[in-house]
Design a protein with these regions (language model features):
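Bacterial N-terminal signal peptides
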Residues: 9-19
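N-terminal leader/linker segments that initiate helical-solenoid repeat arrays
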Residues: 21-76, 317-323
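Short helix-capping/linker turns of helical repeat alpha-solenoids
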Residues: 61-64, 77-79, 84, 97-100, ...
Length: 323
């Protein structure tokens, strides 16, 4: 699927890693990340039983909104000739018009990204509000992103904060992460590191990789929580295990420096290489430094480990389609 500034599921709010002179240390002012339009979540891992495709197709064609939404997801995630943004848009539209809130959010994602249709932020906002009126937490989160980023609406941090707060209190881990981000930076509210850390913790405990990454960063810097390299390392590990490249880079730095763990240049090289293989080059300076300290055999071993990590990545949602 083509992507744009919203569609990756993760918006890097600013440069993640600020290296000190010579690349020797992690910056104490490392910024955080925020979740973008679609909630970061695992794809197709729900409590919904797997049904026969012909049955789903028949029920969708008969007007069942749940199955229409599932076929929309299947169409947009398909590989090869079965991939069809237009077909996904059609299924989401049918389910959304029947009042199915997850499909309304998914249709908004399609409109906001211009997938299967010209981009239309007004239509995206319309469907998000329809889902929000039904109390669907992901809609609150996505409306917050609209106002935070100023897409189709006037940029308004206070309004974004209000939507994130509603979503966070409804249990949406993306909204919890972003509410923490707002408190962390003082956007739409007074800056409050302790409250930021509390919301990051809720999101992290729910398994949100950005929440895990941002909480790790709080522990690394001792903001809102006591400084604790071991806790930072542990949370970076959890986010890295979910494929979060920024966490992988920071994990590499911690292994390289022996912070929160035993010093392990080979592991550092593996994690940063895994991030680079995923398209994130921000650990390049440390990677270059480590290359000079590892033997050819060690580098080959580390690269093999990085390739294994990359192949075994859990599939993170690039679009956060609601099910």
């Amino acid at each position: 699927m083509k992507t744009n500034s919203w569609g990756t599921g993760i918006l890097v709010a600013m440069v993640l890693l600020v290296e000190s002179a010579g690349g020797e240390g992690l910056s104490p002012t490392t910024p955080k990340e925020q979740c973008s339009l679609a909630v970061v979540s695992r794809l197709l891992q729900t409590d919904i039983p797997v049904c026969d495709g012909a049955v789903v197709q028949r029920m969708a064609s008969s007007g069942h909104a749940f199955e229409q939404n599932q076929l929309g997801i299947a169409s947009v995630l398909a590989v090869g000739p079965d991939y069809s943004e237009k077909e996904a848009l059609d299924w989401f539209t049918q389910a959304a018009q029947r009042g199915y809130a997850p499909a309304q959010v998914n249709l908004a994602v399609m409109y906001s990204n211009g997938w299967g249709t010209p981009a239309n932020y007004g239509a995206a906002q319309h469907w998000l509000r329809a889902a929000a009126e039904q109390g669907f937490a992901r809609a609150y989160f996505n409306l917050g992103v609209l106002y935070l980023e100023g897409h189709g609406v006037r940029r308004d941090s206070a309004e974004a904060f209000r939507w994130f707060q509603t979503g966070a209190e409804s249990g949406d881990s993306g909204a919890q992460t972003n509410l923490g981000y707002m408190y962390d930076l003082g956007l739409g509210c007074a800056k409050n590191p302790a409250t930021a850390a509390a919301w990051y913790t809720k999101a992290a405990l729910a398994g949100n990789p950005l929440g895990e990454n941002n909480l790790a960063d709080m522990y690394l810097r001792g903001e809102g929580v006591p400084q604790d390299d071991s806790a930072a390392f542990s949370w970076f590990q959890k986010a890295a295990a979910q494929g979060h490249t920024g966490a992988r880079i920071k994990l590499g730095y911690m292994y390289a420096q022996g912070r929160g763990t035993a010093k392990d240049p080979l592991a550092a090289y593996s994690w940063i290489t895994a991030a680079a293989l995923a398209g994130d080059p921000r650990g390049g300076d440390l990677l270059y430094s480590l290359e000079r300290s590892l033997s050819a055999e060690q580098k080959a071993q580390a690269k093999q480990q990085a390739s294994t990590l990359r192949r075994s990545d859990p599939q993170l949602s690039a679009t956060g389609f609601a099910q």
